[in-house]
């Protein structure tokens, strides 16, 4: 019998698994009881939770379905979902969790016609993705090569070795008779034949109709025989793990099915291609062929010089659709730093739908528009940007023109926009919450730029604050959530307010955790004023001095895996998600003029709502 605190851990861990990972198809009360008992056994012994998922073999050879043989946005989104669950379990249970992904390529290698080199490239790239989220110690991708039972075998012998060491000869010999006496087994067999006929259609195209049917029967039977051998191997080596599955199973306490994507269907990234539908703001999981044949303007998005996913836009006219199809789309990182570059002369930014731009910025953190028609006057940018909301009003107007003729510019510390509003805005944290006054987004337009050191290019730095929140151990993340800093601007004009913020909070847009932190060293840009910020600890369970805390935050946010160096060019328009991004700038020598605007948050209690402005004016 566990004490109340440990029993609460069991409930918390169960909720995380049920809420974030498990599909719960045909769930039974017995299945829930069994799951909780497995978790209870770990907690009773202060043991690490162990999860096992046989999956992620390789990309299919069918290029009607996928973009290539390497992992892409699909795999990244699934792995990031796993990392999120791992961090949340760590936050409520200090021993944490180890999540094993057992790559089952060798189990089925004789039937899927994928080169061994492609499998190893695929697995290596998966590990790099996990490493980019700083989770390699807890999300492990393993294979037969990691187990003594397969010592002495070469990798092309693992397929046969699995059958010889862990197979059930009687199951294989009596397969036809067993299939006729077990409806579930027969349905699995028929389902495999149907799936593999479609998945391997290019490989099977050289066969006659009769030979193709024979080969499909051989493949379906062979995969079921190998699957049974794999089950025996996994039971022998991972018998103490909670067994997860990418296939649909009733939740009765044996195998727990997963939805890999937010879409509640049993789809896998190695048989699919991702498309971000900017009209809805959601990823769509489907075959490459179906995406390309869907309505709208479909653009390939590149990352690390290879196809990564698709992007769907809409156009008002056929002519505009043709122009938008010429856009080049690239990502700096796996899921942040989108660049849309026009390769067509005289394409205005108004050709892009405002709602779709907002969805892109919300999802990818920053969106750079390059090569579009330039704004000749601030009012042009103001008129365009205010189509989708009211701008934050400053004493000097809605557009902040940050022009400098200085030859040397110091680095701009990391921060987020309007973290310390000027006193004339009347923002008081006793009256307003973070989401009441913090702009959801802002834009930076590079009107002119000359850099004497770097060939006309200077870098603005952005940090993926959402990735930062899952890159740290869940236990530390919660300590940072319970740590608050007071930021006090060191200036007399325009008298910005001192504000208090936790280091980790929830994004009002996406509801994901984000890091909220500003570097105290250096000068921050507040309208046309530069000032330094003093930070002091208001509350913290782990820190009593600012210096070691700032050192740790510099380690987290200074990680190159989280940072994007935006090589700003003249005419670039940078749209920024102010909640999921921290911004800074590198030092440079030269001249630069930037125009900046922020949109008011869509809160009924915004300081710029008429009723609040009237109240503030009366008080003034």
Task: Identify the residue ranges that each predicted region occupies.
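Active-site environment of non-heme Fe oxygenases that use a 2-His-1-carboxylate facial triad
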Residues: 304-348, 405-620
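Terminal domain-start leader segments
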Residues: 36, 327-421
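N- or domain-start disorder-to-order transition segments that initiate the globular core
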Residues: 1-52, 301-358
């Amino acid at each position: 019998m566990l004490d109340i605190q440990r029993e609460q851990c069991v409930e918390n861990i169960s909720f995380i698994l049920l809420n974030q990972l498990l599909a719960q198809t045909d769930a039974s009360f017995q299945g829930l009881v069994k799951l909780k008992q497995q978790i209870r056994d770990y907690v009773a012994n202060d043991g690490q939770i162990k999860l096992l998922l046989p999956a992620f073999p390789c990309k299919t050879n069918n290029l009607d379905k996928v973009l290539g043989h390497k992992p892409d946005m699909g795999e990244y989104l699934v792995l990031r979902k796993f990392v999120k669950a791992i961090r949340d379990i760590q936050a409520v249970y200090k021993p944490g969790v180890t999540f094993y992904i057992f790559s089952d390529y060798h189990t089925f290698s004789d039937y899927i016609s994928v080169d061994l080199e492609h499998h190893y490239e695929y697995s290596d790239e998966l590990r790099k993705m996990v490493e980019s989220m700083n989770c390699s110690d807890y999300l492990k991708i393993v294979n037969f090569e990691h187990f003594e039972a397969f010592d002495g075998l070469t990798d092309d012998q693992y397929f046969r070795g699995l059958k010889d060491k862990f197979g059930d000869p009687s199951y294989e010999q009596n397969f036809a008779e067993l299939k006729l006496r077990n409806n579930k087994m027969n349905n699995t067999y028929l389902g495999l034949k149907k799936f593999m006929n479609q998945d391997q259609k290019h490989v099977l195209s050289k066969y006659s109709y009769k030979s193709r049917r024979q080969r499909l029967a051989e493949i379906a039977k062979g995969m079921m025989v190998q699957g049974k051998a794999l089950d025996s191997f996994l039971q022998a080596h991972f018998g103490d793990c909670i067994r997860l599955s990418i296939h649909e199973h009733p939740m009765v306490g044996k195998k727990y099915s997963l939805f890999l994507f937010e879409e509640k269907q049993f789809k896998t990234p190695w048989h699919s291609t991702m498309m971000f539908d900017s009209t809805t703001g959601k990823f769509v999981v489907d075959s490459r062929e179906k995406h390309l044949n869907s309505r709208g303007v479909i653009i390939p998005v590149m990352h690390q010089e290879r196809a990564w996913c698709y992007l769907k836009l809409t156009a008002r006219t056929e002519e505009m659709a043709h122009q938008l199809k010429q856009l080049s789309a690239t990502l700096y990182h796996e899921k942040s730093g989108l660049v849309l570059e026009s390769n067509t002369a005289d394409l205005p930014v108004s050709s892009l739908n405002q709602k779709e731009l907002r969805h892109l910025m919300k999802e990818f953190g920053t969106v750079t528009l390059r090569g579009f028609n330039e704004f000749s006057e601030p009012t042009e940018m103001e008129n365009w940007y205010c189509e989708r909301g009211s701008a934050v009003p400053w004493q000097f107007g809605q557009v902040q023109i940050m022009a400098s003729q200085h030859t040397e510019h110091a680095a701009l510390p990391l921060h987020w926009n309007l973290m310390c509003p000027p006193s004339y805005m009347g923002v008081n944290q006793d009256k307003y919450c973070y989401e009441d006054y913090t702009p959801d987004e802002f834009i930076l337009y590079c009107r002119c730029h000359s850099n004497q050191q770097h060939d006309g290019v200077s870098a603005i730095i952005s940090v993926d604050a959402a990735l930062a929140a899952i890159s740290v151990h869940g236990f530390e993340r919660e300590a940072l959530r319970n740590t608050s800093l007071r930021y006090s601007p060191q200036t007399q004009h325009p008298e910005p307010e001192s504000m208090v913020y936790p280091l980790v909070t929830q994004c009002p847009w996406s509801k994901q955790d984000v890091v909220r932190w500003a570097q105290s060293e250096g000068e921050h840009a507040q309208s046309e004023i530069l000032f330094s910020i003093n930070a002091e600890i208001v509350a913290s369970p782990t820190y009593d001095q600012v210096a070691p805390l700032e050192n740790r935050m510099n380690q987290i946010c200074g990680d190159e895996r989280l940072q994007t160096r935006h090589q700003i060019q003249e005419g670039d328009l940078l749209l920024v998600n102010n909640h999921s991004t921290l911004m800074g700038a590198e030092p440079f020598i030269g001249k630069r003029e930037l125009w900046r605007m922020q949109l008011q948050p869509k809160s009924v209690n915004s300081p710029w709502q008429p009723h609040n402005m009237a109240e503030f004016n009366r008080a003034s």
